[in-house]
């Protein structure tokens, strides 16, 4: 794959044979950021589990202390008092049948987080084929099927991120923007990694195989998986 001159210059700063500690890795990610826009800093964690087995799934949510720097668009499926609660908490879209119809008929998914009250799941369940592949389906495990709508909306807006394994046993998660600076990014990174470690299933051996930190356009920087925090 051909990479541009700026990428190649940035990549020269990274020792591909070295496993960095988290602070060094984030510092280097900032130094190798060269895009004209405010790049997102991402963490990619490869785990020693088999995602094909239900008892080895790793997923959860965590509120990053400094947010993600992204304007999070929240949709809530609710009626009556819970719909009002969602609106007052700052949800961008609130509704029931009409929103289900819009998603079903138009394939509309211009939102980042989808929350529902438990009584709405019979209706929302019809949207599995649209919302499921995009990771938007409300789920009790991730706190997005709940009666505490206000809390869920506020956490989503504040920078709650959901992490889950992909088919290759890797978790991909943003921890903020380059403009955050090293200290805020490091705090977000440690909060995320702590949550992933706590979500460990009963698998034997070394849990974390590899950790890579990178900006949107920059090179990957490897973190020592034996010292993830």
From Swiss-Prot:
Q: Which Pfam families match?
A: Ribosomal_L1 (PF00687)
Domain of life of the source? Bacteria
Q: Alphabetically, which GO biological process terms does the record hold?
A: regulation of translation; translation
Q: Which InterPro entries match?
A: Ribosom_uL1_bac-type, Ribosomal_uL1, Ribosomal_uL1-like, Ribosomal_uL1/biogenesis, Ribosomal_uL1_3-a/b-sand, Ribosomal_uL1_CS
UniProt keyword list: Repressor, Ribonucleoprotein, Ribosomal protein, RNA-binding, rRNA-binding, Translation regulation, tRNA-binding
CDD domains attached to this UniProt entry: Ribosomal_L1
Statement: the UniProt record of this protein carries the keyword Repressor? yes
GO MF, one term, reads:
structural constituent of ribosome
Tell me the subunit arrangement.
Part of the 50S ribosomal subunit.
Record function comment: Binds directly to 23S rRNA. The L1 stalk is quite mobile in the ribosome, and is involved in E site tRNA release.
- Stated family: Belongs to the universal ribosomal protein uL1 family.
NCBIfam families noted in UniProt: rplA_bact
Protein's UniProt name: Large ribosomal subunit protein uL1
Q: Which organism is it from?
A: Caldicellulosiruptor saccharolyticus (strain ATCC 43494 / DSM 8903 / Tp8T 6331)
- Which gene does this sequence derive from? rplA
